[in-house]
Structures are given as structure tokens and as C-alpha cells.
Design a protein with these regions (language model features):
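N-terminal cap/lid segment of alpha/beta-hydrolase-fold proteins
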Residues: 1-20
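Short, surface-exposed "cap/lid" segments of acyl-processing enzymes
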Residues: 18-54
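Alpha/beta-hydrolase active-site loop
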Residues: 47, 51, 73-98
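The feature captures the conserved acid-bearing segment of alpha/beta-hydrolase catalytic domains
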Residues: 128-194
Length: 231
């Protein structure tokens, strides 16, 4: 799908509809964003992108958020910008023409900046926000910890792998976000363990940071909470 999101700018997204969907999950990948199109299919190794079928099996419509035509690689500053919010709003408007299901924003790593910041911007027009491997440590351009989280007014799940050793997504900082989510009607910090055989640098998708070899379990935990948000 390709949507006109700003003057002379289009933003693509990958749409996976599900009959009788309990919700629509809009997935924001980490790194510089995007879907990793190759041969007409999403090929990114990002945790959320590679787990898209698991979300579909859980009974959700799935939308993979692409990058806008004027910003092929996202950065933390853009993820907090009015331009990014305009892109997200336009994509959600298009999604609503396809399904009336309530919308959840789900981000991982750098994508948690997008999910949280856009969630603040969108207010009650969305159902909730899920943050995985949350970018809560210090980095140039800002992190989730720097956002006005007291203005995030929908249910929020912070889902974190206990063995995530990426220096900008440590579990202890993710846990501290709970104290800042004062407007969220329901909030939950869920720290999990599992998986095996991590490879590559600790901030990459096939390490514990990306829930390696526990993708199905992680998606099941997230999906259950989306369907029944409890503290």
C-alpha cells in the first residue's frame, strides 16, 4: 500500500488483513525503520517484521509501517517530528477505510520512539501502545525517556527481555518508564526470559534484544495483553 501523507510525499505500508480481527497492530521496526523490501516481500530481520505472521495468527490485522519517500532512513529526531506524525496519521486513516478494528501501535528498539511519540500525538484515536526492547537510554536525538510520557493517555505495555544487553535498551531503564506513564489508564512492565543462540552485536535483531528463538512466545505474551490489558 502507498499513501499520500504530505505534499509530494508518499509512505508505504504492508497490509495483512484478518477476518474478524480483534485489533490492528501497526508495527514500527527499529534501526533506520522500514520493511526491508526484497523481491516484493518484507525481508527485514527486525523482530517485529519477521514476527508478522505470529501477530496475524493471534487474530490481528497487521500493518508494517514503511518509511516516507523523502526520508528513506529514519533517525530519532525525525521519529519525534510533526512530519512523522503526519505520515502515521495518514496511514492510520487509510487503514481505517479497510478495517474498523481498534488500532495499537507496536514498536521495537528505535521504533519505540515512533510508537510512543505518535501515541502521544494521536491521543484517544488509538487503543494502546506496546514498546519492546525500549530505547530508553541516552543517545543523540533523544529516546523514549525524553518524551512527555505523562501525556500518553492510552494503555501501555513495556515488554523487555531480561538478557537484553544493548547499552541503550537496558531493562532497568525500561522499568523506570512506569513512573512516567501517569496518564495511562492501564500500564504494565513485563520482563521476560527465554530464547537461545544469540548472534551478532547485542543491539542487533538476532540477539536477545530481538527475542531470538522466542519470537512466538513473545508475540503470544504481547497479543494476550493487547486483548486483555491488565496492570
Amino acid at each position: 500500500m502507498s499513501v499520500s501523507t504530505r505534499p509530494e510525499v508518499t509512505t508505504g505500508y504492508w497490509w495483512m488483513p484478518r477476518d474478524g480481527a480483534a485489533a490492528t497492530v501497526v508495527l514500527f521496526s527499529g534501526g533506520t525503520g522500514g520493511i526491508g523490501y526484497r523481491d516484493g516481500e518484507p525481508k527485514s530481520g527486525n523482530f517485529l517484521i519477521r514476527s508478522r505472521d505470529e501477530f496475524a495468527k493471534a487474530g490481528f490485522n497487521v500493518a508494517l509501517m514503511g518509511n516516507p519517500s523523502d526520508m528513506p532512513k529514519l533517525n530519532p529526531v525525525f521519529r519525534q517530528s510533526p512530519e512523522h506524525f503526519a505520515d502515521v496519521r495518514a496511514v492510520l486513516q487509510d487503514i481505517r477505510t479497510r478495517s474498523p478494528a481498534p488500532i495499537w501501535l507496536v514498536g521495537t528498539s528505535q521504533g519505540t520512539i515512533s510508537a510512543a511519540a505518535a501515541g502521544i500525538d494521536l491521543g484517544f484515536s488509538i487503543q494502546g501502545v506496546v514498546l519492546t526492547a525500549t530505547l530508553s537510554g541516552h543517545q543523540f536525538g533523544g529516546s523514549v525517556s525524553d518524551l512527555p510520557l505523562d501525556k500518553l493517555s492510552v494503555p501501555v505495555l513495556v515488554h523487555q527481555h531480561a538478557k537484553d544487553s544493548c547499552k541503550i535498551t537496558p531493562p532497568y531503564l525500561a522499568a523506570r518508564l512506569m513512573g512516567k506513564l501517569t496518564a495511562a489508564p492501564v500500564k504494565k512492565y513485563m520482563e521476560v526470559d527465554g530464547g537461545q543462540n544469540p548472534t551478532g552485536p547485542p543491539c542487533e535483531a538476532f540477539h536477545y534484544h530481538g527475542y531470538i528463538e522466542m519470537e512466538s512466545e513473545a508475540v503470544a505474551q504481547i497479543s494476550a495483553w493487547i486483548k486483555h490489558p491488565v496492570p
